[in-house]
Amino acid sequence: MTHASNTHPVTELTKELIARPSVTPLDEGCQTLMAERLAAIGFNIEPMVFEDTTNMWARRGNEGPVFCFAGHTDVVPAGDLSRWHTPPFEPTIIDGYLYGRGAADMKGSLAAMIVATERFVAKHPNHPGSIAFLITSDEEGPFINGTTRVIDTLEARNEKITWTLVGEPSSTLKLGDVVKNGRRGSLTANLTVKGIQGHVAYPHLADNPIHKAAPFLAELSQTHWDNGNEFFPPTSMQIANINGGTGASNVIPGTLEVMFNFRYSTEVTAEILIERVEALLTAHELDYDISWTFNGLPFLTGEGPLLDATRHAIRQITGYDTDPQTTGGTSDGRFIAPTGAKVLELGPVNATIHKVNECVKIDDLEQLALCYEVILEQLLC
């Protein structure tokens, strides 16, 4: 095992960002560091603070088209510190990998974006169009006061983004082997099935909501929602939480609470899913309350300049072709896509994200910056 320093500019900036313990929704000065670098190359910096969330909109240029790097400075908690090989907020290079919370998700991407932009502007100081950065500290948290609020602000003044590259860790086995050119929609239900609480010895004096709901839940879990399409897998429904009872063995509960989530394709809409679920509840003659939370619409970036530029960049820098996919969880791209912007995600290998000993290959950081730079050249030169 070797512990070594590294002078790659992307690695050094990534280390500076990791050293700031920006557990969501904290930013801990990450955006200030980024803003200083961007201001030095002609960006107008516009901080946008909403409640406990720090956001930044930075832009260089006043004309279209607008290419936007999007990302987040917040990270998930480190978890059990005893399971980390090195302190999570003390960036350490071991055997060619940089360890630390946020190394892959997504401070490495942020550093690559900054360095790529610095290089691009140095070569093309009078580039056409505009380059922008949309950065938040509320991606890993409730995503209430982050990207969605910045987009609301931009939309209110009719400031449009043409293309967005999100730095989420899209890669699976090696850098750039997968890019995300879309995401499924996400819809969450909070269901309360009502019964009558009572003693288990006197079931005729009570009404057990668990027994009543069981056939409904069985049918819900076995329902086929759609077949998906060439871009999206079939819609999936998963029960995430069930809670009922007092904890005592002799009490029939009065209510049953169930939370379930849909990850849905473009073959259905949230409205269709809601209608089908509520029809199923009615068919099972349940007494219920239900509330719905829209977490994001599905989006897809098909063939066009952004996907073409990204494919070209990955092929040029890595020597292999990328695979555009729409699988996985949601990202802040879901808040940007409804404005009409084309959205794509390209970032490091995601094998260690949200885990102890999160790490990124340092050679990948430099290659990622080169990919980002080529994408800028393809779209703005």
Swiss-Prot record:
Involved pathway(s): Amino-acid biosynthesis; L-lysine biosynthesis via DAP pathway; LL-2,6-diaminopimelate from (S)-tetrahydrodipicolinate (succinylase route): step 3/3
Enzyme Commission (EC) number: 3.5.1.18
Record: residues binding Zn(2+) 2: 105, 140, 354
HAMAP family per UniProt: DapE (MF_01690)
Job of this protein: Catalyzes the hydrolysis of N-succinyl-L,L-diaminopimelic acid (SDAP), forming succinate and LL-2,6-diaminopimelate (DAP), an intermediate involved in the bacterial biosynthesis of lysine and meso-diaminopimelic acid, an essential component of bacterial cell walls.
Cofactor annotation: Zn(2+); Co(2+)
Organism, as annotated: Shewanella sp. (strain ANA-3)
Catalysed transformations (reactions): N-succinyl-(2S,6S)-2,6-diaminopimelate + H2O = (2S,6S)-2,6-diaminopimelate + succinate
Keywords: Amino-acid biosynthesis, Cobalt, Diaminopimelate biosynthesis, Hydrolase, Lysine biosynthesis, Metal-binding, Zinc
Name this protein carries in UniProt: Succinyl-diaminopimelate desuccinylase
Entry coiled-coil feature ranges: none
Cross-referenced PROSITE patterns: ARGE_DAPE_CPG2_2 (PS00759)
Domain of life the protein comes from: Bacteria
Cofactor note: Binds 2 Zn(2+) or Co(2+) ions per subunit.
Family to which the UniProt record says this protein belongs: Belongs to the peptidase M20A family. DapE subfamily.
Lineage summary: Bacteria, Pseudomonadati, Pseudomonadota, Gammaproteobacteria, Alteromonadales
Pfam families: M20_dimer (PF07687), Peptidase_M20 (PF01546)
Active site, renumbered: 74, 139 (proton acceptor)
Subunit-structure text: Homodimer.
GO MF annotation, one: cobalt ion binding
Residues at which Zn(2+) 1 binds: 72, 105, 168
CDD domains in alphabetical order: M20_DapE_proteobac
GO biological process, one term: lysine biosynthetic process via diaminopimelate
